[in-house]
Amino acid sequence: MAKKEGKHNIGAGIVRALMYPFAKMPLRWHYFFAGFIAWLLRAVLHYRQDVIYTNLAKSFPDKSYAWIRKTAGDFYRHLAEMIVEAIWFSGCRNPERLRKARIVELVNPELIQEAYENSPSVMVLDTHCGNWELLGGLFFYNFKDCECPIKPGVLHVVYKALKNKTWDKVFYENRRSPTPDKEGQIEASGMLRFIASHRREKYIYLVNNDQFPRESSCEVGTFLNQPTTGFVGAATLASRLKLSVLYMGMVNDRRGHYSIRFERICDDASLMTPEEITRRYYDLLEKDIKETPHNWLWSHKRWKNIK
């Protein structure tokens, strides 16, 4: 086991070393390469083309094929920009580089501050909108003149480990680039144990909640015109521990800039069922997707249980 772990660490080190020269380039140079990557994904590799087109067509049955095709193209461009932004982010060992680029801004940090002050802990339900690979810099995205509780030692991000251990190590270290000496990531399989054992401590938990659920699921109802099951584990924990629950939306409002907005789902999750919390989350997510359709991860097999 130790030998395999060492092999993965070496592989991850090689990948990150190859990324390093590109990571130090100015962000605007990365967007120059993004155009080529988008073309490569769409026109040459046809990356998950069937999944993307099928998801879009079923989610927007009233739209024309021309609209589906354009939105798919916009998504490929967005995906390419996410890739180059993640590479650039790996070079942000100096948080000032993040703040100077102002690539992400918190629109209403006062809402999460209020929730944090008035709740045992806060459960923030995230999505696959925007660029979640930039969330390792959340501590540095508040440009408003108000207090924000998103700080190292307070924020704990729940993530799902990749099957490929080398790439899992690459992304794990990448997300920690601005704060490499700080811990704060929880693997999804250990979420229940960690939160239960730290229930007397005040934390903010960030959970990406819109993937296809393999366990702890419920029937959400109709989401994007399709019957959908949703992951309910985070909502169940929040309900049992009487946590405040927020939705976190991330919008790519222009190239090189994302806005993060929090919306209150409930102040005390014990007053709602986990199913009600999850339904409200999906209502907010659907609203965001309809406003900026290309901004979601259409290449994900979200409805793999539907024939």
PLM feature spans:
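Non-catalytic C-terminal accessory region of glycerolipid acyltransferases
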Residues: 2-6, 141, 177, 188-307
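Short, flexible loop segments at the rims of nucleotide/cofactor-binding pockets, characterized by
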Residues: 98-104, 180-186, 223-225
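Membrane-anchoring hydrophobic helices of lipid-metabolizing enzymes
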Residues: 2-131, 170-174
